[in-house]
């Protein structure tokens, strides 16, 4: 309840962003983001992982969702939804345990520093070679004067791109 009371709009945007549904409320500006997160399938991963949670953990997630939904119902009833919902012209949907897990997976992605491209670059280097890496990703090399040293340091490092 209290989390929603203080952060409902941010929670809703995080849920939408992680689920690939941001464009539903911000329009075309959210389409590229939606495409990316639909490919990442964080929501599907949350749905799959939920099956493996203990009954106790599921109950905690359900209680949390119930608290969020209590605030949503109260705020709708009393016309006290955060003003951002009015600005964008929509009301929040009820919260689910899957929403919590999806946002958690999004936070792990977001706080992880988006290192996925570095792993991919390293994979190209070690599987296709330095010249192919420079041809495939020329912009990466024109910006950093230390690239030759970085390439040498990264050669032979085993990296998975999955």
Where are each of the predicted segments found?
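Substrate-recognition/specificity elements adjacent to catalytic centers across diverse enzyme folds
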Residues: 1-162
């Amino acid at each position: 309840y209290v989390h929603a009371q203080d952060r409902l709009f941010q929670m809703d945007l995080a849920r939408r962003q992680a689920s690939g549904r941001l464009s539903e409320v911000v329009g075309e500006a959210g389409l590229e983001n939606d495409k990316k997160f639909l490919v990442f399938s964080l929501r599907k991963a949350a749905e799959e992982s939920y099956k493996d949670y203990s009954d106790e953990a599921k109950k905690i997630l359900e209680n949390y969702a119930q608290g969020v939904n209590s605030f949503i119902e109260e705020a709708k009833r009393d016309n006290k939804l955060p003003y951002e919902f009015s600005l964008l012209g929509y009301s929040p949907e009820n919260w689910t345990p899957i929403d919590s897990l999806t946002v958690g997976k999004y936070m792990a992605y977001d706080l992880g520093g988006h290192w996925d491209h570095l792993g991919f670059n390293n994979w190209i280097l070690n599987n296709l070679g330095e010249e192919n890496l420079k041809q495939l990703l020329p912009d990466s090399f024109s910006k950093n004067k230390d690239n030759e040293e970085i390439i040498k340091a990264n050669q032979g490092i085993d990296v998975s791109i999955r």
